[in-house]
Amino acid sequence: MPSDMLQFPSENDRQTFERLVSELPDLIHKRCHDYDELYGHKLLEEGPAEVAKFYSKDHAHALLFKFLKANAFSYEGAVKQLVSTLNWRREFQPLKAAFAEEHDERLMAAGYISYDASAAPNTRTVTWNLYGKLGACKDLFADQDTFIRYRVGLMERGLQALNLLDPDNCSMTQVHDYKDVSVWNMNADVKKCSRRVIAIFQDHYPELLYAKYFVNVPTILRWVYDVVRAFVSEETSRKFVVLNDGTKLAAYFAGVPAAYGGTAPATLAELPKPASRPSPYALFLLQKHISEELD
């Protein structure tokens, strides 16, 4: 939402936000190697005109607010997480994972992003993760980066469907479907990758999740949910819902396929999708990377 509409629990929290805004340039220059991109948005109103034009105060402030909220408006906590996130993005290059890299088609078949502009608040953008399909590509988990770059890329594409200035579409919903998953196809490599992904999302994507549904989870696999809870904050875990029967998902939000108890198109592939194009600043950075690689 626009900067003047941000809601602070107290005047002290507002002052903490203003401090972070004022000290952000120094933080980025001194502790983040000048890297100022966050989820495709520019955090600083600096640089040549052709770069500075990508800055939006409202978007930058909305993102800073999320980091503060995730840390109970602790300045030190928010700064630590923000600095860590910007340095991770500078090194990992998640925008490239989302828009410039090709991923194994077996992985691509295990994840979908749907978008319904008429859906209830913050259920418009949904990422679907079909873990049962990963049993056919366990070989890909031996190199953890293969799966992690795919999974982060899916997350980043989903973020492009959000509108940080719209309180009804500033967070996403996630569905993790464990149909056809058994203890036999969750080997050590899969578990290690899962833990790394959970840690990445907890550390570097604060306040972007509205709700997460674990569906078709057999009792014998409840440990998966327990592992996830162990890696996330209590605030995040309160957004989790576990459903043994996937057809009950329709009771929580509309627009889901028949397999989940809804009346939408029969398959996830038929659900309406967002454009998922990179933001203007993300596109500029991607083109810059390509140009530098060619040089």
Curated annotation (Swiss-Prot):
Cofactor(s) listed: heme b
InterPro entries: CRAL-TRIO_dom (IPR001251), CRAL-TRIO_dom_sf (IPR036865), CRAL/TRIO_N_dom (IPR011074), CRAL/TRIO_N_dom_sf (IPR036273), Sfh5 (IPR042938)
Domain CRAL-TRIO residue range list: 100-268
Secretion signal, residue range per the UniProt entry: none
This protein's encoding gene: SFH5
CDD domains associated with the record: SEC14
Catalysed reaction, written as an equation: a 1,2-diacyl-sn-glycero-3-phospho-(1D-myo-inositol)(in) = a 1,2-diacyl-sn-glycero-3-phospho-(1D-myo-inositol)(out)
Major location (coarse): cytoplasm
Example GO biological process: regulation of exocytosis
Gene Ontology cellular component terms for the protein in this record: cortical endoplasmic reticulum; cytosol; endoplasmic reticulum membrane; plasma membrane
Keywords associated with the record: Cytoplasm, Endoplasmic reticulum, Heme, Iron, Lipid transport, Membrane, Metal-binding, Microsome, Transport
Entry's localization field: Cytoplasm; Endoplasmic reticulum membrane; Microsome membrane
Membrane-protein topology: Peripheral membrane protein
PANTHER family tied to this protein: PHOSPHATIDYLINOSITOL TRANSFER PROTEIN SFH5 (PTHR47669:SF1)
Function: Non-classical phosphatidylinositol (PtdIns) transfer protein (PITP), which exhibits PtdIns-binding/transfer activity in the absence of detectable PtdCho-binding/transfer activity. Regulates PtdIns(4,5)P2 homeostasis at the plasma membrane. Heme-binding protein that may play a role in organic oxidant-induced stress responses.
Organism encoding this protein: Eremothecium gossypii (strain ATCC 10895 / CBS 109.51 / FGSC 9923 / NRRL Y-1056) (Yeast)
Pfam families assigned: CRAL_TRIO, CRAL_TRIO_N
PROSITE patterns per the UniProt record, alphabetical: CRAL_TRIO (PS50191)
Family: Belongs to the SFH5 family.
Chain residues that bind heme: Y131, R151, H176, Y178, K212
Protein name: Phosphatidylinositol transfer protein SFH5
Residue ranges that the Swiss-Prot or TrEMBL entry lists as coiled coil: none
Alphabetical list of SMART domains matching this protein: SEC14
One Gene Ontology molecular-function label: metal ion binding
